[in-house]
């Protein structure tokens, strides 16, 4: 197993241009596919999850051209649904942002489509989405365990009508349903059951759908109305914002050991909810400065917070490791959906924080972290989860440094993360 030793860092300073957002990249690729016309996507994220989406689209007959560095994609839209005369089997790795939307999109056309992935993908639920698609006439068959991939779609199109979908586990199910609703055979009324988690990710979806010419009537996130007869039309060019979750590590670095760290590609005009991570750092005592497309973090003594972070679940992980440098006990609440991500992030985070000496209480949907008087060095297991590796890079700011096991798992969203992280030191 590969290991990366991060020696103690005294101070950080510098500027980082954040790579494209995973959430926006895969949504935009699918909408561009369904749209009429040619779309040029710039600042596309070059990572495993996006490669799985691109490979699947190519297999389904979508034509696109990538720049040499894979960050510009010119894609020829199908001007409608995806169909295939021959049976197709698509491997989607552990990419939830490809599995869920493609599962929904492939019900719209004609053909037989089987979706598979890595072993962890077979533990990541998709039942709430499939239940909703079945209400609209979709034929979806589970191949192993009910409610989980792999699965086969026997597509004949999607009917309109009223549909209920659970909102309390993952916003990706609602996102997938919203994106395909305009291409159903009639108007679609989506009723959300339970409290909707990660609302800002739904805002990303609605903003991108609007960019491609589709109107959704949002009734306070409890009901969504999509009138029949709409179609996606390419806006020509789509700029993919920097990934706000990825920005969180560099902003936390500035808050803990600044110096001054500036991240570009996200700012006050961002459509991503995870930029609100900077507000949490500010509550902890960091000095934060906002621009339209940048955020600056400067360091100071941090103090603990007790907050509901359901709206920023990915970025909230960074608060868990930043808490080791804060005075007092930090509590991160309403984060049950950490448990169904790339790994069970609540259990993994608690285990690894204890390794470095923290006192941790792991609840069903919360975590309490009290930092130790002295942080211990340790070998951090990353569970093939990119965010675990990046979060625990913050331990380089302890006097003892840290060792990260399997650091290359960051390739899921940020292949050169540790190179960028090293550029801030000094």
UniProtKB/Swiss-Prot annotation:
Q: Which CDD domains match?
A: EPSP_synthase
Which residues hold 3-phosphoshikimate? 22-23, 27, 170-172, 198, 314, 337, 341
The residues responsible for catalysis, as annotated, are 314 (proton acceptor)
Q: Name one GO biological process term.
A: chorismate biosynthetic process
Checking HAMAP family in the record gives: EPSP_synth (MF_00210)
Q: What does this protein do?
A: Catalyzes the transfer of the enolpyruvyl moiety of phosphoenolpyruvate (PEP) to the 5-hydroxyl of shikimate-3-phosphate (S3P) to produce enolpyruvyl shikimate-3-phosphate and inorganic phosphate.
Q: Which family does it belong to?
A: Belongs to the EPSP synthase family.
Q: What name is this protein filed under?
A: 3-phosphoshikimate 1-carboxyvinyltransferase
Lineage of origin: Bacteria, Pseudomonadati, Pseudomonadota, Gammaproteobacteria, Alteromonadales
């Amino acid at each position: 197993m590969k290991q990366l030793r991060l020696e103690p860092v005294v101070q950080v300073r510098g500027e980082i241009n954040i790579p494209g957002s995973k959430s926006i990249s895969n949504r935009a690729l699918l909408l561009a596919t369904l749209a009429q016309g040619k779309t040029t996507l710039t600042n596309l994220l070059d990572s495993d999850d996006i490669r799985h989406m691109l490979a699947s689209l190519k297999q389904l007959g979508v034509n696109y051209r990538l720049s040499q560095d894979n960050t510009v994609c010119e894609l020829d839209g199908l001007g409608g649904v995806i169909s295939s005369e021959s049976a197709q089997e698509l491997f989607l790795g552990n990419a939830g942002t490809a599995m869920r939307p493609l599962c929904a999109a492939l019900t719209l056309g004609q053909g037989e489509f089987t979706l598979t992935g890595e072993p962890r993908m077979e533990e990541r639920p998709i039942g709430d989405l499939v239940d909703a698609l079945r209400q609209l006439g979709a034929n979806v068959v589970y191949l192993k365990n009910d409610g989980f991939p792999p699965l086969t779609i026997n597509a004949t199109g999607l009917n309109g009508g009223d549909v209920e979908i659970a909102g309390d586990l993952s916003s990706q199910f609602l996102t997938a349903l919203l994106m395909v609703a305009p291409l159903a055979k009639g108007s679609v009324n989506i009723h959300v059951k339970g409290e909707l988690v990660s609302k800002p990710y739904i805002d990303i979806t609605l903003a991108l759908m609007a960019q491609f010419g589709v109107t959704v009537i949002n009734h306070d996130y409890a009901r969504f109305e999509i009138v029949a007869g709409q179609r996606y039309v390419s806006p020509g060019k789509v700029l993919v914002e920097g990934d706000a979750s990825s920005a969180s590590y560099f902003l936390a670095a500035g808050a803990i050991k600044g110096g001054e760290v500036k991240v570009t590609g996200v700012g006050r005009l961002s459509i991503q909810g995870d930029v609100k991570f900077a507000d949490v750092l500010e509550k902890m005592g960091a000095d934060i400065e906002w621009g339209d497309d940048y955020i600056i973090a400067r360091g100071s003594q941090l103090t603990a917070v007790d907050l509901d972070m359901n709206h920023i679940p990915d970025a909230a992980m960074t608060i868990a490791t930043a808490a080791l440098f804060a005075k007092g006990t930090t509590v991160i609440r309403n984060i049950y959906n950490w448990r169904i991500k790339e790994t069970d992030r609540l259990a993994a985070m608690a285990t690894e924080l204890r390794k470095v000496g923290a006192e941790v209480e792991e609840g069903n949907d919360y975590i309490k972290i009290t930092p130790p008087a002295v942080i211990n060095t340790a070998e951090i297991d990353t569970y093939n989860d990119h965010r675990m590796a990046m979060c625990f890079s913050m331990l380089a700011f302890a006097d003892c440094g840290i060792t990260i096991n399997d650091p290359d798992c960051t390739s899921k969203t940020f292949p050169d993360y540790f190179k960028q992280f090293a550029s801030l030191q000094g």
